[in-house]
Amino acid sequence: MSFCYLEKVCILFFLNTRKPTFVKIFFGMTTFQDLDLSNQLYNSIEELGFTHPTPIQEQSFSVVRSGKDVVGIAQTGTGKTFAYMLPILRDLKFSKQITPRVLVLVPTRELVLQVVDEIEKLTKYINLRVLGVYGGANINTQKQAVAQGTDIIVATPGRLYDLGLSNVLKLKSIQKLVIDEVDVMLDLGFRFQLLNIFDLLPRARQNIMFSATMTDDVDELINDFFKAPQKISVALSGTPLDNIQQTSYIAPNFYTKANLLAHLLRDRDAFTKVLVFVSNKRRADLLFAALEEIFGSES
């Protein structure tokens, strides 16, 4: 479980280690005004309260826009979604075509929902369609949504492969493929689906990959399917970022962490905008119920 008050501090509660970690991200001098954003994108960013891109966002912008294959090494909390979506959205024009032009693969249902939500915020003033598909939901409902058309599809590998095999989802129109948290994806056993998804895609496309670590499996995937990728790294593979300050507290169980979170959130001056991340839907429901008792409609 983790939460961030935007542009200041992220607090990560690692359930397996029982330690919450305070992560403070320091931003550089570049502002979003310095990037070549469209007015629509900049207005969305401004409404979200962001002024400075994170290092991975700043470094990725021109590289992704170049159209070359990209491999980014960045850890959780560094703003990876905006790092690849801002340059993609900057150049993605309005189209009436039914089939998607951008495919974003993520390892879990929760990440699909999170990425779709962030894309919808960025495209508030842009006429683009985004659709999320994942396992555990009715596939027939998702087939109907696909048939209505979308510009960007965000998916877990298993469900995307099922939709591709059913011939409902046509992937030959994909111009940009993003694989986010590929190391997690491979750890979860999605290698077979990934390899088969590559076969469904056109050869002429841009490949964009983000990973927290550079493992042998990730490296093999890059060698097999990427063409002279540009590599961006805000830290050495598998090491903490230099611009992150971490402080840990021992919390023995979920309820202790929830109480600690509630205690911290009472500091209204420090925590004005907060994002909370948990490991699964059940945890999200439990945490929401606990915070609702304390904060009411604010939670």
Predicted regions mapped to residue ranges:
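Conserved helicase RecA-like core
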Residues: 1-299
